[in-house]
């Protein structure tokens, strides 16, 4: 009878039990892959996961397999070929041994230190057995550092031997160019390399430190005498109490400077000062809130600190004799903070109350700092050069493109072709100028003066235009405010100074008398009196001389007779053409004379109802010189 292999019971119904630990009842897999090849493996477990003893090697089989010599199976092994030769500069390329060392340097003539410890790195280059010594840079050491010994092979004795990596170890001294270096440690690569070459390394040592450098690293000890002032009490009493002052900084003395407004805050809790700039809309400045951060402000520095550059000075209590306090901020007084002068012009109500209670100062009025309009700048004209009119020359200074001066158009229209003519003589110390006569014409439309000298035959003086039409400045007036001659300045007996020449007015024409009569308010009593005296002299009968009778000039008598003859002929055929205006158009200077060519041109344009012989005789009598004709007397013959 078959029994159960587990517990030995007969394999009968009711005696067979199910093993709950067995879950896999498939057949073992015998096909697989190894190194890419399909292989067959013997199953090691059966159905249900029971291990099969049939396919397992025994211990004896395993021992037999282990005792087999591979040579018996595979034969004698071939000897490996020798490795290729590699030179030292290739094998040890970029392989460097690093040692940490130091040397001691004497410091003579120093009270603070007698020697100095300088830490270095010694580099040994395996490719060519060269060495270099590098000193790490220490900040603010004051000595040249960096490469002390450049890369080279270094001698170790007087026989010419050089240092080799076998001579280097931890805890030894080496001498290089008279300096003794103490090697204290090496890096990890150096330690591994030396140990691989069979060198036993000494234990590492502690790096020696420079005593003076370590002393400088220690914080300075301050010995401060305790004060009776209690800062904690000040902090608790004046916490959140701030004095506010309004100030300005006037920088107009510098180029492109201006006045800026600031707010100065003084914190009573710790006596610190803060300055803020007041910005306006569209002022074109960066809107940074603070000009100066909150800090204590030194007022008086010690003398030693003044010689030290302030740009690198760290201000402490040792450099400051006096700090700014609340009593230094007074309304109406300037205050210099860090080289910038501020003028305090106002404060807030809390500050006024604090000053009244603390210092007894109650008079802190607000100072008006509003911008005042500067007075208008008076334009300074360059000196007058004497050419042209002053108004015309001044236009070059008013605009880039000069413009003509403004003219009184209404005056020009009302006084068009109105000319005041005067007979004048030249006041001169020279006898040849005594008999010279001039015609002064004053143009009412433009206030200009022209002077014409009638030519006199055989006088030796060339007549004609003496002064072109221009404005004449009165003597004594300045170039800035020139005063020109006006109609009221011309009267009989008046002296007119024209550019250094003095003219005395002797007579006037009838139009001047009519103009003075209609505009008597413009003239002085002296001018009116001179005209009245002149009229009386003309109307008075000529006095009879004893034994003599005034003889009339025959030339004048003949001219008057000729004019009477022509006017008698014009009674039947009167001349209605305005000949005078035709001559005045060509006589720009209003001198009463025109040249001969112009005279005949004008006469040819009119049909004069007079005999040609009378006209030729009248032209001969009105001629002055070879080229000038007096058209005044000529026109007088044709006037009704």
UniProtKB/Swiss-Prot annotation:
Q: In which tissues is it expressed?
A: Expressed in trachea multiciliated cells.
* Subcellular localization: Cytoplasm, Cytoskeleton, Cilium axoneme; Cytoplasm, Cytoskeleton, Flagellum axoneme; Cytoplasm, Cytoskeleton, Microtubule organizing center, Centrosome; Cytoplasm, Cytoskeleton, Spindle
* Residue numbers spanned by region Required for its localization in the mitotic spindle and interaction with alpha-tubulin: 1-45
Give me the Gene Ontology terms describing cellular component. axonemal A tubule inner sheath; axonemal microtubule; axoneme; centrosome; mitotic spindle; sperm flagellum; spindle pole
In this chain the EF-hand domain maps to: 574-609
Q: So where does this one cross the membrane?
A: none
MF terms from GO for this chain are: alpha-tubulin binding; calcium ion binding
Biological process (GO) annotations held by this record are: cerebral cortex cell migration; cilium-dependent cell motility; flagellated sperm motility; mitotic cytokinesis; mitotic spindle organization; regulation of cell division
Keywords (A to Z) from UniProt: Cell projection, Cilium, Cytoplasm, Cytoskeleton, Flagellum, Repeat
Q: Does the keyword Metal-binding apply?
A: no
Concerning PROSITE patterns, the annotation shows: DM10 (PS51336), EF_HAND_2 (PS50222)
Oligomer and partners: Microtubule inner protein component of sperm flagellar doublet microtubules. Interacts with the C-terminus of CACNA1E. Interacts with alpha-tubulin.
Its name, as the record gives it, is: EF-hand domain-containing protein 1
